[in-house]
Amino acid sequence: MARKAMIEKWKKTPKYSTRAYTRCRICGRPHSVLKKYGICRICFRELAYRGQIPGCKKASW
């Protein structure tokens, strides 16, 4: 319930622009969000593993 409330609060425009912060579009996680994709590292890893992010593949060297 608290997470849903925070997501609803995040969707509103803040009184000052500096109060705005990024959240994952899928799970609502506020930390470690990749701005380019708008999702957190955990969701990014799952989607990349399934091949749902075009042009993304696992690095190995």
UniProtKB/Swiss-Prot annotation:
The protein's required cofactors: Zn(2+)
Disulfide cysteine pairs (residue numbers): none
One of the Pfam families matching this protein, by short name: Ribosomal_S14
InterPro entries on file: Ribosomal_uS14, Ribosomal_uS14_bact, Ribosomal_uS14_sf
The record's free-text note on cofactor binding: Binds 1 zinc ion per subunit.
Domain of life: Bacteria
Any single Gene Ontology cellular-component annotation: small ribosomal subunit
Gene Ontology MF terms in the entry: rRNA binding; structural constituent of ribosome; zinc ion binding
GO biological process: translation
Annotated keywords: Metal-binding, Ribonucleoprotein, Ribosomal protein, RNA-binding, rRNA-binding, Zinc
Residues where Zn(2+) binds: 24, 27, 40, 43
Protein task: Binds 16S rRNA, required for the assembly of 30S particles and may also be responsible for determining the conformation of the 16S rRNA at the A site.
Quaternary structure and partners: Part of the 30S ribosomal subunit. Contacts proteins S3 and S10.
Recorded family membership: Belongs to the universal ribosomal protein uS14 family. Zinc-binding uS14 subfamily.
HAMAP family the UniProt entry points to: Ribosomal_uS14_2_B
Record's protein name: Small ribosomal subunit protein uS14
